[in-house]
Design a protein with these regions (language model features):
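A glycine-rich dinucleotide-binding beta-alpha-beta segment and adjacent secondary-structure elements
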Residues: 175-183, 398-464
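Mid-domain catalytic core of redox enzymes
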Residues: 241-359
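N-terminal Rossmann-like FAD-binding beta1-loop-alpha1 element of flavoenzymes
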Residues: 6-33
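C-terminal segments that line or cap access tunnels to active or ligand-binding sites in enzymes
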Residues: 308-416
Length: 490
């Protein structure tokens, strides 16, 4: 990079940074995007090996239709990235004998109302009796009647406390708890009811399970390609070392590849690494620093990448859960103390079942995972990986016979790739800040930092929703904020 003076610098080409940079360039700002890795995508990065194309761990998004994913592509003049697979997903729940049984769903069509027959089949699969069904109907009816104002009043109530009003059947509660774990990667008795209900409405109206042609990370690679065509400058393998601040005003970024000047910096590195390391505590008041240090991350995913000698699963992704395997606060605390659960919730994604081009003919890659603490140095990882192997074979007999090779991954891998550890036991989180009570809605950290010209983008500020969709939502919102700031101060 020969030039070093820009209108704005975006740190990180993840699901928040890459779309935000593209939108800024489209708006006419001379923008630099720096990324410490050799490609875009962040936690949703897509890689290639031995003919397989896959993410480093399971990634799907939502909503599937009318999404911010498709909106960013349209804004950049790009074609839809939505895959056209057939068998969408399967959920597995144990019967009375402890044998996991499947409930399979085909790829949903857009603008299709809920199917009452399918809903009843799901209740039968869960073993819900008539009394339980009445409680579920009352819960669903009253929740559907909530206005946006009503939902906003639930920022300080956990989803567990909200649903506990209805005396729901245990299997149905377990399914809701599983959804809290998979969509938000936090315990059901911590997730804010407002966030859960608002995002669930988006999913109900437009389905879940978004995946991009060419791999999930391909969506963000395309954003960067468009960014470059719009005149943006990209620096891969460029690690931000310091955000330069003088007299309360951003001046630029110091990196391993030189120093770049700009009056605006947008950080996709996470609010805690940005404040505590890239900027430095000395530039903020003590109350703000304490608030940032107190922010709680989501839980993490750890697991195994299995490379199979033949296709084993037909569905594009699946989730196996039970009354004993979803993660609540009590179970999470036991795991943080080093206990390996007897029963694990399992989340698998099969990229080539979304897009057949992502695996060699006659083979399959299975990205398997379970929830765990976010500590990059969590203990007993080998025991967790062995437990995952055992759960995979127990739930899906014959699976292990198809495994040609495998690779394990854990919280240290996540932290090293995407989020530097700046506080004890934090850094390996799956999403970023947890969407828990005290950190959602009116309590969400502001995207504009208390330093002139500094903004946060991604899952930590500026958006709402499910994982990567929250990050892209943030990209739109923060790009608008930055454009306005530039107009006022440029």
């Amino acid at each position: 990079m020969t030039q070093n003076q820009f209108d704005a610098i975006v740190i990180g080409a993840g699901p928040g940074g890459a779309p935000c940079a593209a939108l800024l360039a489209k708006g006419g700002l001379k923008t630099l995007l720096i990324e410490q890795n050799n490609r875009a995508g962040g936690k949703a990065m897509t890689v290639n090996k031995d003919g397989f194309t896959y993410e480093l761990w399971p990634v799907t998004g939502g909503p599937m239709y009318n999404s911010r994913f498709e909106e960013i592509l349209a804004q950049l003049g790009l074609s839809s990235g939505l895959t056209e697979h057939t068998i969408h997903n399967a959920m597995y729940y144990p019967d009375k004998n402890g044998v996991y049984q499947a409930y399979v769903s085909n790829r949903p069509e857009p603008n299709t109302p809920p199917n009452p027959e399918a809903m009843m089949a799901q209740m039968k699969w869960l073993g819900i009796d008539e009394e339980g069904l009445e409680a579920i109907i009352r819960f669903a009816t009253e929740t559907a009647a909530l206005t946006p104002y009503d939902i906003d009043q639930l920022d300080d109530i956990t989803y567990h406390d909200y649903v506990s009003r209805y005396n729901l059947p245990t299997p149905f509660y377990s399914m809701l708890a599983m959804q809290s774990n998979i969509v938000y990667v936090v315990p059901i008795d911590q997730v804010a009811a407002s966030e859960f209900i608002k995002t669930s409405r988006d999913m109900m109206a437009n389905s879940a399970g978004y995946y991009s042609k060419g791999g999930y990370g391909r969506l963000f690679e395309r954003c960067v390609e468009a960014f470059e065509k719009l005149g943006g400058t990209v620096g891969y393998r460029t690690r931000a070392e310091k955000i330069i601040v003088e007299n309360g005003q951003v001046r630029g970024v110091q990196s391993n590849n030189g120093t770049f000047s700009a009056p605006i910096v947008v950080s996709n590195a996470g609010i805690q690494p940005t404040v505590l390391k890239l900027v430095g505590e000395e530039h903020f008041d003590r109350g703000y620093v304490n608030r940032v240090k107190d922010l709680v991350p989501s839980l993490a995913l750890m697991g195994t990448r299995y490379y199979l000698n033949k296709p084993f699963f037909k569905e594009a992704f699946n989730i196996a859960f039970s009354d004993d395997s979803y993660v609540n606060t009590e179970r999470s605390m036991r795991a943080k103390k080093g206990e390996v659960p007897e029963e694990l919730l399992i989340f698998n994604v099969m990229p080539s079942n979304f897009d057949p081009e992502l695996a060699p003919s006659g083979k399959q890659c299975v990205l398997s995972s379970t929830l765990c603490p976010a500590d990059p140095d969590m203990p007993r990882t080998e025991d967790w990986w062995r437990k995952i192997d055992g759960m995979m074979e127990r739930i899906w007999p014959g699976f292990s016979e198809c495994v040609e090779s495998k690779e394990t991954y854990g919280t240290r891998h996540v932290s090293d790739l995407t989020r530097e550890q700046v506080l004890p036991k934090i850094g390996g989180e799956c999403i970023g800040l947890g969407q828990v009570v005290g950190q959602c809605g009116k309590h969400k950290p502001a995207a504009a930092a208390p330093i002139r010209g500094l903004f946060y983008v991604g899952c930590d500020a500026g958006g709402y929703g499910c994982g990567t969709h929250q990050a892209v939502d943030s990209a739109f919102n923060v790009a608008d904020m930055v454009a306005f700031y530039h107009k006022m101060h440029g």
